[in-house]
Amino acid sequence: MSEITPEVVESHGLSSEEYDVILKALGREPNLVELGIFSVMWSEHCSYKSSRLHLKKLPTEAPWVICGPGENAGVIDIGDGHAAIFKMESHNHPSYIEPYQGAATGVGGILRDVFTMGARPVANANALRFGRPEHPKMKHLVQGVVAGIGGYGNCVGVPTVCGETNFHPAYDGNILVNAMTVGVADTDKIFYSAATGVGNPIVYVGSKTGRDGIHGATMASTDFEEDSDAKRPTVQVGDPFTEKLLIEACLELMATDAIVAIQDMGAAGLTSSSVEMATNGKTGIRLDMDKVPCREEGMTPYEMMLSESQERMLMVLKPGKEEMAAEIFKKWELDFAVIGEVTDTQRMVLEFGGEVVCDIPLGPLADEAPLYDRPTISLEEYKAWAKIAPITDAPDSADPGADLLKLMASPNLASRAWIAEQYDSQVGADTLQTGGDAGVVRVHGTKKALAISTDCTPRYCYADPYEGGKQAIAEAYRNLCAVGARPLAVTNCLNFANPQRPEIMTQLVEALRGMGDACRMLDFPIVSGNVSLYNESKATGGGSAILPTPAIGGVGIIDDYERMMTMGFKNAGDTIYLVGPEFWATPDPTRSHLGKSLWLDVVHGRDEGRTPPTDLVVERNAGKIIHELIDDGLVNAVHDVSDGGLAVALAEMALSGGTGADVEQNSEYTAAQWWFGEDQGRYVVTVPDTEALNEALSKGTENAETAQIGFRRIGTVGGDGLLGVSLADLREAHASFFREWMEV
């Protein structure tokens, strides 16, 4: 065994203070295997040591929540004996180093988190952030990431139904790749990770262990340096065909009564899976490392425990079920090996070559791992540090039609068809909607459908992390409501920079506070998630810290998919209404919000102003009203108003439906305020029968919840243009960015 020097400790990402804690926990010096295990289990990626204190404050419970944070994925009851199981995970650092494999294995990992719990995956989604398109590496990164996501998801046979892709200079040196999977299971056939039953066999299944991905979790818990190419060996290599076999083999075994517990080997591989299973079961674990299936000669216990080779699972089986399970995995041409047993010691003991090479108490590895309450500053101090001030000289729009064309052609609003065409969105034959406010997939064999949305506005989060956190949750809620779904629960991926900087820690704490307030008001609990910190880069040409990016994945249920709503204009002559805060019906121009708007940035080159506030009461009430209008058949199209404001929402509806609209500006607002302000809590709806709508609204006026929601007639569906611009020109502008960028 190698000598443990201060340099070796530092190379494992451990501080001298943390090493002292290890010495105290063991009562001796660790060997290299033990040091490696501590290093990955105490990494930010596995231990959440900088965020755990604050994550505990999030709302995680509701009558329909079956399992919240702490397991492989969140589980919610969707009725009729079915559960939705879902989670979002990051694969940021690997995707910058090796974009295809980084993104592909991100998809593979999140798929395993979901089917580990007994669900058949039914939909994938993603949230991607890239740097400036003109950055010399960015086209390569975009092409690789998109190909990796598509290549893996398509081969496994799970449709990618929604996602978001944004560009900003803050991601020049540190892109974000967040992947989400949703699965469906029977509520009485959900599998958990707690290893119980002393003497029960521990079984390794899937692919063989190689040297790829060693210290991937540690690498994902530090800032980037300039030598990213040297870190390629820490990026895992995925095989989607093996993953497909693994899904089918696991689901087949799950149909029997053989499994006691199951866990995928994700970050930190065999180490984290075994530690988590024993910790959750309040037991111990003994592994015979000689029995671990390896694909390379001479692998050491250190390498086996820290490898992040893909497509592997760890199980605890009932005694006597090994032979039957082995036959199933043999049929699917996958490795199967009994490598250990559950003990009552609450210790991790590893044996190799007839010797004990690791003997660690589980407490210090998991529940007793370091926990940091890192320094923060006040929100007002933060805004002063970030130089956030209100706009005092907001410009107007001299030609809203011309400005709309610029916006629709800009990287952050341009058509994502180039991306979507690389994803198979229809495999499985249950996809009902893509490219709308939310992706929608049928719950196979039922009338129900799941709606899925991914949302976050990082520029809002930078200017005001609290309001940005609220808005991210609220927009996910709006997007689900807009397709006719009842929002049920949230998963998240919290992407932030170095938490040891008080300003960055403030971003994280305030964003979580905003998210928590929004989830409580909207009855929209958080059931799973992931934290990715140290998203900073010293890479040549890169920026420093990313924008705070708490990516939100929302899931809702549509009880009858025939009532699903889409955004496209349908019928000429339908009346168009703007629905939202009542001050839009009784104008108050002082409340129109151009700060941090895309219009101000794209048209005027000004990334300025404050984040638009999110009124959570308005969000809740407007969502309920939209849901009722859809259920009652009173609207033909619904779309939420977000990036780019009202004009962009109308343009997206026109392009989706293939017909224009005649719309009017409220003269009490400037053209910029009316068409491009990004006030929150708003929807655009089209109504075929205004009398029926008015009758429904008149009945609703007695309901206090409708009192703060205004309806304003703004135009009529029809024609072949919008704001003086032809649909043909709008479509060309919208399609131009990716086509021209990728052809160069």
UniProtKB/Swiss-Prot annotation:
Superkingdom per UniProt: Bacteria
GO biological process, one term: 'de novo' IMP biosynthetic process
Active site annotation, chain numbering: 45, 91 (proton acceptor)
Keywords: ATP-binding, Cytoplasm, Ligase, Magnesium, Metal-binding, Nucleotide-binding, Purine biosynthesis
Binding-site residues, Mg(2+) 1: 89, 530
EC number(s) on file: 6.3.5.3
One GO MF term attached to the UniProt entry: ATP binding
Compartments (UniProt record): Cytoplasm
Enzyme's top EC category: ligase
Cellular component annotations (GO), alphabetically ordered: cytoplasm
UniProt binding sites for Mg(2+) 2: 113, 264
Pathway linked to the protein: Purine metabolism; IMP biosynthesis via de novo pathway; 5-amino-1-(5-phospho-D-ribosyl)imidazole from N(2)-formyl-N(1)-(5-phospho-D-ribosyl)glycinamide: step 1/2
Main location: cytoplasm
InterPro entries in UniProt: PRibForGlyAmidine_synth_PurL, PurL_linker, PurM-like_C_dom, PurM-like_C_sf, PurM-like_N, PurM-like_N_sf
UniProt-annotated binding residues for substrate: 90-93, 112, 236, 308-310, 532
Binding site residues for ATP: 48, 87, 492, 529
Chemical reaction(s) catalysed: N(2)-formyl-N(1)-(5-phospho-beta-D-ribosyl)glycinamide + L-glutamine + ATP + H2O = 2-formamido-N(1)-(5-O-phospho-beta-D-ribosyl)acetamidine + L-glutamate + ADP + phosphate + H(+)
Subunit structure: Monomer. Part of the FGAM synthase complex composed of 1 PurL, 1 PurQ and 2 PurS subunits.
PANTHER family given in the database record: PHOSPHORIBOSYLFORMYLGLYCINAMIDINE SYNTHASE SUBUNIT PURL (PTHR43555:SF1)
Chain's role: Part of the phosphoribosylformylglycinamidine synthase complex involved in the purines biosynthetic pathway. Catalyzes the ATP-dependent conversion of formylglycinamide ribonucleotide (FGAR) and glutamine to yield formylglycinamidine ribonucleotide (FGAM) and glutamate. The FGAM synthase complex is composed of three subunits. PurQ produces an ammonia molecule by converting glutamine to glutamate. PurL transfers the ammonia molecule to FGAR to form FGAM in an ATP-dependent manner.
Family: Belongs to the FGAMS family.
Protein name per its UniProtKB record: Phosphoribosylformylglycinamidine synthase subunit PurL
Organism this protein belongs to: Erythrobacter litoralis (strain HTCC2594)
Organism lineage: Bacteria, Pseudomonadati, Pseudomonadota, Alphaproteobacteria, Sphingomonadales
Gene that encodes it: purL
